[in-house]
């Protein structure tokens, strides 16, 4: 069992979204056709994992509230940021330079897990990866993503947003990990719908030779999925 991996570098959001949709539809079609055909010899992939860095863009999930977008679309575009309403779960978030975005388009049924376990695995992959670089992070009950700080000390900051779409156990969209992201872009939104929690990055300062390329392999993802 394996998945194809593609590091796309810096790619426009809409171009990458179109690629995701194409891979997503093709994987569902292949899956459904196999249910009516005889089993084939040989190992097939469970899908494709895309890693990418986007130019500045805001996205709003299908159940998100437009009130969490604090400034109008025209203003966002005036500062060089695009805006899209998309079909993932979650609310509004930002993607931009200094952020690793991962899109696993995979058949999680072949992994023997459901959507909740899949999201848990994504979160744990990020937790383990940032721990490798000396950053202690964790989950927040009742909220997706990966967080720094603690509720007790009232200093929770999200370093990784997660939002997915799934159909017939095939996934798309995924995670966005802040490495050296310009956090000022988050001032224009209530990130992921929260008004009382911030965003952060810590990995950049933890690296002896800073650079987003050092994290692209995400060394703990394979062990979780």
Regions found by a protein language model. Name each.
Residues 159-162:
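Histidine/acidic-rich helix-loop-helix segments that form or flank divalent-metal centers
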Residues 168-179:
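Conserved phosphate/anionic-ligand binding catalytic regions in large, soluble enzymes, centered on
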Residues 164, 181, 204:
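Active-site donor-binding loop signature of nucleotide-sugar glycosyltransferases
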Residues 1-156, 184, 215:
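N-terminal lobe of the biotin/lipoate ligase/transferase fold
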Residues 184-225:
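C-terminal accessory segment of soluble enzyme catalytic cores
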């Amino acid at each position: 069992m394996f998945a194809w991996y593609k590091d796309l570098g810096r790619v426009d959001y809409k171009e990458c979204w179109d690629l995701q949709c194409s891979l997503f539809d093709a994987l569902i079609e292949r899956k459904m056709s196999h249910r009516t055909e005889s089993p084939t010899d040989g190992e097939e992939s469970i899908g494709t994992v895309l890693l990418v860095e986007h130019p500045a863009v805001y996205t709003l999930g299908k159940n998100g509230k437009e009130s969490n977008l604090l400034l109008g679309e025209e203003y966002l575009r005036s500062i060089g940021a695009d805006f899209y309403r998309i079909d993932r779960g979650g609310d509004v978030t930002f993607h931009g330079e200094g952020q690793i975005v991962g899109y696993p388009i995979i058949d999680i049924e072949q992994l023997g897990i459901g959507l909740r376990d899949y999201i848990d695995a994504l979160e744990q992959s990020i937790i383990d990866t940032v721990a490798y670089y000396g950053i202690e992070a964790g989950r927040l009950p009742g909220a997706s993503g990966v967080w720094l700080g603690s509720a007790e000390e009232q200093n929770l900051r999200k370093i990784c947003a997660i939002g997915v779409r799934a159909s017939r156990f095939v996934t798309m969209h995924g995670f966005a990990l802040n490495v050296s992201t310009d956090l000022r872009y988050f001032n224009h939104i209530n990130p992921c719908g929260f008004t009382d929690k911030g965003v952060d990055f810590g990995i950049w300062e933890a690296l002896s030779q800073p650079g987003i390329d050092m994290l692209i392999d995400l060394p703990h993802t394979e062990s979780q999925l």
